[in-house]
Amino acid sequence: MSINAFGIDLGTSNIKIFHKNEDAILVEKNMIAIENKKNVFAYGDSAFEMYEKAPANINISYPLSNGVIADIKNMETLIKYFIGGLTKGGVKGADYYVAVPTDITEVEKRAFYDLIKDANVKAKKIMFVEKAIADGLGMDIDVKKLSRQQYIGYFKIWFIVLGIV
């Protein structure tokens, strides 16, 4: 029996989504272009190509700012669009594993939960994974193993010991 699950890393610049069922990975710019303040004109990389070149009636924005959700409506639109593009035959009930920054508040964490719940992507379960742990797993590091290693990210340095950041 295959598990319908998605791993989502909502970065300020890029969205990364892994679909376990399809063994597919999507990496797109976390941008959206809105025409006349109501119609979606472009998503992801297409919106990025228009950045600073679009006419005045098209607003291009990043729905995330400093790792937290700044525009929930546009972020929901992006999630729905990208997950719909990864699934063949539509989204069925799925588990969602969302990478969240270690240093966010419970209110900010709740915004990530509400984002997935309200995006109409048929979430059965929504679970959070600290970004440092998700990054370690992505680098094929045994995060539960006791070791003396440090990992230097783009802006942060973290130590993972026995699965704790």
Question: Could you describe each region identified by the protein language model?
Answer:
Residues 1-12, 16-28, 33-41, 45-152, ...:
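Nucleotide/phosphate-binding catalytic cleft detector across ATP-hydrolyzing
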Residues 158:
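Conserved phosphate-interacting/catalytic interface
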